[in-house]
């Protein structure tokens, strides 16, 4: 069957979130003119959090995560690790020069009518779709790698500017073992 860019991006977002269910949003929070939050997409409670005395006298707050676990965290991390290879060695390698921790997957439909890229960092999943409302070829050699990856690269470079580079979160019990690509050792 068919899917949408939003559903596909949500699925990749689930992987990078350790296999936990996510709900995409366009608006995360709305505050009134006095700084009071009147809408918050993230409904998790922060029990015991109080900023009245400032944060310095409190331990780091812990948010209760009640999201459904959709896949095993280890399996999700393995998928993320494989998709990281798309950036390092595959069809997304043109943006590896950004010096960010990224992963993703390109896609191109038959006859090059659509090109897409779903990419993510440890904190943000983004879907890019390039195509016409009435399907027709994008052009010779126009693929997800050539039309969608550069758009993702421009966006993620801007969105990540000034933020610390962090690795993908590895669940407990996962050991990384380097394997030589030619010898398998």
Where are these regions (language model features)?
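A penicillin-recognizing enzyme superfamily signal
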Residues: 1-185
């Amino acid at each position: 069957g068919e899917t949408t860019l939003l559903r596909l991006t949500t699925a990749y977002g689930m992987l990078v979130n350790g296999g936990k269910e996510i709900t995409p949003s366009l608006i995360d929070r709305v505050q009134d003119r006095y700084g009071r939050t009147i809408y918050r997409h993230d409904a998790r409670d922060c029990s015991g959090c109080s900023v009245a005395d400032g944060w310095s006298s409190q331990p780091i707050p812990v948010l209760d995560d009640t999201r459904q676990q959709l896949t095993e965290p280890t399996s999700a991390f393995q998928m993320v690790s494989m998709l990281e290879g798309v950036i390092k060695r595959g069809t997304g390698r043109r943006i590896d020069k950004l010096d960010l921790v990224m992963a993703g997957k390109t896609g191109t439909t038959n006859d090059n009518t659509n090109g897409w890229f779903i990419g993510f960092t440890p904190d943000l999943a983004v879907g890019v779709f390039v195509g016409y409302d009435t399907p027709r070829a994008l052009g010779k050699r126009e693929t997800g790698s050539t039309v969608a990856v550069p758009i993702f690269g421009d966006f993620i470079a801007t969105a990540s500017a000034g933020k610390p580079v962090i690795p993908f979160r590895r669940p407990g019990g996962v050991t990384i073992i380097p394997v030589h690509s030619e010898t398998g050792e």
